[in-house]
């Protein structure tokens, strides 16, 4: 088994999903957000550069507007997300400030990273913020994103968005926090003998086929989108860890090399002269 070595990792993208930020009751998980802010601030104090990709706008919006479930109407979905995004960033700003860490907001649509001019601008924005010691908090701009064939601006979900952000910022590592322990050889909710894959070097058709199921009622990303995100990370010669976000402090353990979650890392070919 390959040993995980993250000593040389400087720039880290951390992605947290709605299911990790919102309790099953629909209320905001304040303890989880506080832990996340502590972990990221600790990493910043150690000289790391951290970008946070955060879902949760819809979950926050549903809570504020006291709605039981996400609307089926697109315009109402966008309205709820717009309300929730403000609340989410306000809370992040307050809690990160407790740890003397400044944050900023970057809202992206897919067309921004497709066109070279806008891609250059957003890349420069990331670099400027990082150089100032600020944590960029990234989300999709749900209020304006559309998924129409002639003008598709949606990423699909924040799993893919986090892989895109890791690529354009040339991050050393993407850490994806989810409500599952990692990638299993089969669905652990159905099969008791399902085994956690500690290391994945190649995304095979078998892995893609076994990654099924949708996300939670508050979020959208299922296992398939996480596997597809790992594929994007591989295409950018990067690495990714998919792990349970129940205890964000586990991120520090992962960076120490402890074998939590699933490590997606291609095996480098050895060339002989």
Curated annotation (Swiss-Prot):
**Might you give the EC number(s) for this enzyme?**
2.7.2.11
**Keywords of the record:** Amino-acid biosynthesis, ATP-binding, Cytoplasm, Kinase, Nucleotide-binding, Proline biosynthesis, Transferase
Query: What metabolic or biological pathway is this protein involved in?
Result: Amino-acid biosynthesis; L-proline biosynthesis; L-glutamate 5-semialdehyde from L-glutamate: step 1/2
The positions annotated for binding ATP are 15, 178-179, 220-226
Q: Which InterPro entries match?
A: AceGlu_kinase-like_sf, Asp/Glu/Uridylate_kinase, G5K_ProB, Glu/AcGlu_kinase, Glu_5kinase, Glu_5kinase/COase_Synthase, Glutamate_5-kinase_CS
A GO molecular function held by the record: glutamate 5-kinase activity
Q: What GO biological process terms are annotated to this protein in UniProt? A: L-proline biosynthetic process
Q: Which SUPFAM superfamilies does UniProt cross-reference here?
A: Carbamate kinase-like
Question: Would you name any one GO CC term?
Answer: cytosol
Purpose: Catalyzes the transfer of a phosphate group to glutamate to form L-glutamate 5-phosphate.
Q: Which family does it belong to?
A: Belongs to the glutamate 5-kinase family.
Q: How is this protein named in the record?
A: Glutamate 5-kinase
Q: Which organism's genome codes for this protein?
A: Streptococcus pyogenes serotype M6 (strain ATCC BAA-946 / MGAS10394)
């Amino acid at each position: 088994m390959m040993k995980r070595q993250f000593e040389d990792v400087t720039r880290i993208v951390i992605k947290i999903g709605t299911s990790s930020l919102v309790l099953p009751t629909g209320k905001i998980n304040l303890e989880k957000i506080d832990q996340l802010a502590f972990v990221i601030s600790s990493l910043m104090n150690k000289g790391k550069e951290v970008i946070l990709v955060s879902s949760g706008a819809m979950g926050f919006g549903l809570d504020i507007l006291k709605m039981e479930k996400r609307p089926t109407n697109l315009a109402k979905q966008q309205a709820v997300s717009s309300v929730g995004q403000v609340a989410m960033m306000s809370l992040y700003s307050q809690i990160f400030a407790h740890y003397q860490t400044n944050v900023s907001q970057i809202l992206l649509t897919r067309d921004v990273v497709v066109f070279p001019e806008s891609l250059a601008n957003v890349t420069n924005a990331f670099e400027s913020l990082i150089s100032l010691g600020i944590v960029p908090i990234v989300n999709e701009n749900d209020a304006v994103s559309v998924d129409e064939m002639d003008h598709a601006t949606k990423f699909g979900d924040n799993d893919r968005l986090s892989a895109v952000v890791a690529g354009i910022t040339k991050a050393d590592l993407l850490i994806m926090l989810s409500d599952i322990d990692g990638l299993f050889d089969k669905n652990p909710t159905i099969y008791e003998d399902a085994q956690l894959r500690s290391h994945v070097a190649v995304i095979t058709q078998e892995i893609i086929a076994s990654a099924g199921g949708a996300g939670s009622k508050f979020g959208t990303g299922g296992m398939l989108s996480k596997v597809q995100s790992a594929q994007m990370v591989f295409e950018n010669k990067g690495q990714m860890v998919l792990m349970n976000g129940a205890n964000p402090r586990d991120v520090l353990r992962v960076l120490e090399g402890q074998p939590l979650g699933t490590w997606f890392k291609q095996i480098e070919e050895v060339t002989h002269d």
